[in-house]
Amino acid sequence: MRRALGATLWLAVSACRPTGGTPSGFTLLFFDHSPAAALAGRSWVPLPDSSRLVAFDPQLRIVRTLTDPRLNTPVGVVPYRGRDLLVTEFTGAGVVVDTAGRVLREWPGPFTASLYTAGGGHVLASRSPYFVQPLAPESPTAPLVQLLDSAGRPTDGLGQLHVPSSPFLLGPTNAGALAADSGGAFYFGPLARDEISKYDRTGRRLWTTKRGLRAHETDPVFLPARGVRLPLALAVVNVALAIGPDGRLYALGSEDSAATRLRVDVLDAATGRILETRRLGAGRTAVAVDARGALAVFDADSLLATAHSPGREPFTPAFALPDLGGVVGDTVPLGHFAGRVTLVNFWASWCDPCREEFPLMAALYGEFDRKDFEIAAISDDVDAGKMRAFVAQFRPPFPILVGGGRMKATYHYRGLPYSVLLDRRGGIIARIFGFGGAAEFQRLHDTIAKEVRAP
C-alpha cells in the first residue's frame, strides 16, 4: 500500500510515556497521525497499515477490531449519528460502519480525495491532507468544505479558498485537517499554513489562531519535473484536529516541514486561545485526555502490542468457480486449496497494474513447491474474449478461475488488483490492495516462506 500525508507525513511521530502509573479513564484524541473517535465509552482508531479499526476501552485495552475489504486504508474516523462510525479512506472514500463492523453505506466523496467529519447533525468534507493530488485544477470560487447529505452527496459549499499562484495548486493549498462540534461549527487547519480557523454552520469565519509553527510561510510549489513526474514542495503544518470530551479543540501540528517534530495544542473552542502546548518525541504516539481533562501521551505500538490475538479470520464467502483450463462444467472450490498457503488474486484484463503484477506472480509461483503454495487467480472480466487474450499473452503457470464480473459485488474490494493471502487452514494472513512492485513481492515472498515453515 502506498500513502502519504501531504508530501511527507507518514513518518515517525513522538513517543513518551505518561507519569502516574496505570492508565485509567482515558479518551483517545489522536493515534499516530490520525484523529480518533469517542463513541459509547470506547475510543476508535484507524490503523491504515493493517486495514482495520480498533476500539480501546477507557483503560486503553483493545476490546474490538473491525476489518472489511472496504476498510482498505482507513486514515480517519469520527462518530456518526451517535451510534455509528464514519471512516475516511486514504483514497478519499467515505465508509459508514456500525460498531459490529457491518458496512452501512459508502460514497466516493466530493473532492479528488476527501476527509470527513460529523457534528451538529451535519457531515462535512474537506480536501484530504492524507492524499494530496496536484494537477487537478479547481475554480478559485469553489468552497473550502462541502456539506453532505446522508448518502455523501454535496448539498452546500461553505468557506472560502486560499488562492495560490497556480490553479493547479488549489487542491494542495486548501487541503487540511477538519473537525466539527455538536453545535454545528467546524474547525479547519490548512495542511501547509500555520493557522486554524473556526466557522459557524453558515461558513462565516469566527476566529483564526496562529501557533508560531513556521517563521516563514510559503504556499505549495512545483519543483522541476523528473521525467513524467512533477514533484510538489509542501511543508506540513496541521496534521489533525479533534474535539475533546471537554469541548476543547485539540490540534496536532508539526514544527518541521517533514512532520518529524510534532506537538499538540489545546485551544479554547469559543475564542481560539491556546491553553496548553505539549511537544512530542520520536516514535508513534497515542494522545489522550483523562477524566479530569489532563493530556496524556502513550507509545502507540505498546498499546497495540497488548492486544489479545483473536486468531485469523476466515476468507468468506467460499467460492466455487470454473477453471479456465479445466473441463467445461467443472468448478474449483476454495476447499481445493486447503493444506497449502494460497494467494487468492483478483484481476481483470483492463487493469494495467494487473499486467505489471502477473510476471511477478509467475516468478513467485515458481519459488515454492506445489504442496506448500498455490495461487488462485480469479478474473473479474465480463468479456470472456478479452480474458482469454490476456491469459494467452502472459501464459501464467497458475490456475485461472473465471469470476464472470461478479467478484467485486461479492468481495467488496474497491479496485484491482486485490489479493488475499491465506494460511493452510484458510485463515487470512494479509490483504494486499493494489500493486506495490518488486519490493512488495519480496515482502510477500518472505511472508509466504515464513508461513510455509510454520508448524
Predicted regions and their residues:
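Short pre-active-site segment immediately N-terminal to redox-active cysteine/selenocysteine motifs
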Residues: 340-342, 346-350, 415
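Sec-dependent N-terminal signal peptides of Gram-negative exported proteins
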Residues: 1-16
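Thiol-based oxidoreductase modules, predominantly thioredoxin-like and allied folds used
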Residues: 372-385, 396-405
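Thiol/disulfide oxidoreductase modules built on the thioredoxin-like
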Residues: 390-397, 402-449
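Hydrophobic beta-strand anchors of alpha/beta hydrolase catalytic cores
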Residues: 343-344, 375, 419
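Conserved redox-active cysteine motifs that mediate thiol-disulfide chemistry
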Residues: 346-363
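Eukaryotic scaffold repeat domains enriched in small/polar residues
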Residues: 16-317, 412
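N-terminal "domain-start" segment that seeds a small globular fold
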Residues: 306-334
